[in-house]
């Protein structure tokens, strides 16, 4: 399933939630619909599907330390690419994959909130020349984060 846009409508429970400060400053006076139009998933050259990760390697009594292997299929325009990296988590893995395929984006801020049955992710990213906020949501927290990162990459690299 592509991470171009969310498959479900934005969670209405988020309307009452406080936005991260930087995004709140940029969107002062805007309706929730306007915030989503400006920062939600958009059409762009980058799409993501087929996300997989391996189990973490256990190191002693701290199983969360170490890297996992992540695999994804990236669609950049009409070009389909397979990517594979080892990283500490899914956002680190995706940003490394994006960099390797010409979408340099660094996550400056990351915020997640529960909104009913959905998780909403707000990311602030930069490619070194411009910075943008993006929003993604999904019933799975990892998928929500990946959607937000893809939306951010499409924005900063536009």
Residue spans of the language-model regions?
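Terminal or standalone catalytic/regulatory effector modules within metabolic enzymes
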Residues: 2-127
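Mixed-charge, glycine-accented linear interaction segment located at domain edges/termini
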Residues: 124-158
